[in-house]
Amino acid sequence: MEQTWRWYGPNDPVSLDDVRQAGATGVVTALHHIPNGEIWSIEEIEKRKAELKAKGLVWSVVESVPVHEEIKTQTGNYQQHIANYQQSLRNLAQCGIDTVCYNFMPVLDWTRTDLEYVLPDGSKALRFDHIAFAAFELHILKRHGAENDYTADEQAQAADYFRAMSEEEIARLTGNIIAGLPGSEEGYTLEQFRSRLAEYDGIDHAKLREHLGHFLREIVPVAEAAGIRLAIHPDDPPRPILGLPRVMSTIDDMRWLKQTVDSLHNGFTFCTGSYGVRADNDLVTMLETFADRVHFTHLRATCREDNPNSFHEGAHLQGDVDMVAIINAILAEELRRQKAGDRRPIPMRPDHGHQMLDDLKKKTNPGYSAIGRLKGLAELRGVELALKRTLFTELQQG
């Protein structure tokens, strides 16, 4: 596996010097300063590449070239946004960058209710509390029809939860959900959020799939011609929320994507934390089934709670993900590719990390503090090395 590290650009509290000291060789980043839908120019791409090269690092994966909301809803200037996306892919390829992660989640990227969930050891994790989210939908956002998504018992629990909240807690929960987490390119006020949700009225699962299919048919041929590996990120959490459809949550969704545009350049970011939230997702089977289309991996573990729709982020080698089996499957695919002549390892990054030790005293991007990810990367590296030394000696020699 190629060991990479997510970096949010010059304003990231974690510096490129820190990244090198963590042992990563590749960087996963994006041009966050360019508005969604606009072309990434060769000049801007080369500028970012030069920043990384000056620190002895390479730009391994783009995460992400954002998909404009008008592409997802097929409204406004969506065809122009697609044309701009195509040109950004060509420009990235011209600059030698060949792996692009993206997602097709409506309105919000990843969603959490608590960004400072305190674990028994005193470190902090990200959490999605289903009842807290219900309280937001039913009593803060007051989304029409939201009650249809919750049982009577969940509605009662949400009402109790909301009644016990202070104004400060209401503001914090609202901000956690709609203000934009790291990697999200847009944040909203409550009124803006309601308006954005309304843009999806009449767009169900089938319609959003149709729109994704159109997008794929437009961009995959460009990716093929340019030598770009597209890697769609799964929904997080992997189920419908806020009355919005989700189209990349299960093995059936992966199968649909492959069949819709059957090209090796139409692939996946295999995020164990996102897919792993669902107990009915067999991660190893999913990975092995679509191994040849996995172009990028996010390795982290989540812990499902008593309410199966609630979860928090666990340590990388704990929780509901069998990380040893996952890395074993990744290495098996790398060996297959190596024998077929493709010697490039699959880029991997330690996804998220607990806020811990000295980082508890610092301002950090939620989920992206340095020390927790450093710990995760070291653990994942150890698993990989042990497997290479025992089961994948050919890769070790390679």
Curated annotation (Swiss-Prot):
Domain of life: Bacteria
GO BP of this protein: D-glucuronate catabolic process
InterPro entries, per the entry: Man_deHydtase, Xyl_isomerase-like_sf
EC number of this enzyme: 4.2.1.8
Keyword Iron: yes
Enzyme class name: lyase
Pathway: Carbohydrate metabolism; pentose and glucuronate interconversion
UniProt keyword Lyase present: yes
Family that this chain belongs to: Belongs to the mannonate dehydratase family.
NCBIfam families in the cross-refs: PRK03906.1, uxuA
Protein name: Mannonate dehydratase
